[in-house]
């Protein structure tokens, strides 16, 4: 019974990792993803772009199965630099990201009407 309980707990702790399987096709250097590549996850999420030391770095596009996407610059696995984030309903943020956060840019609705702005990371 003790072994069964330990196995059940182990399975429950590891199951989130088992369901997030990924497939990588691309370049490697020193055993890490470096250069151009594509990752596809079992949940439908997909990244196509550049890698450095195993992280998204440079230009790339991350798409979720629900239609959400980010296209632009990456640094250390986070949006950083110029990019566009689009939601499934068509709203989008266009501008600068800093360490994964909206920094200086504009949010538009699906008719390209300005909804709001971000200045130095603060929504106006």
Residues of each region from the PLM?
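Glycine/tyrosine- and acidic-biased, solvent-exposed loop/turn segments at the edges of beta-strands
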Residues: 5, 12-124
């Amino acid at each position: 019974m003790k072994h069964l309980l330990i196995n059940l707990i182990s399975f429950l702790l590891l199951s989130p990792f088992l369901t997030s399987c990924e497939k990588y096709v691309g370049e490697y250097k020193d055993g890490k993803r470096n250069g151009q590549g594509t990752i596809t996850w079992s949940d439908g999420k997909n990244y196509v772009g550049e890698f450095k030391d195993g992280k998204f770095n440079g230009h790339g596009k991350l798409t979720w199965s629900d239609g959400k996407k980010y296209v632009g610059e990456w640094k250390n696995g986070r949006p950083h630099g110029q990019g566009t984030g689009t939601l499934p309903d068509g709203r989008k943020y266009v501008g600068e990201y800093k360490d994964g956060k909206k920094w200086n840019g504009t949010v538009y609705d699906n008719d390209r009407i300005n909804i709001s702005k971000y200045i130095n990371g603060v929504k106006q």
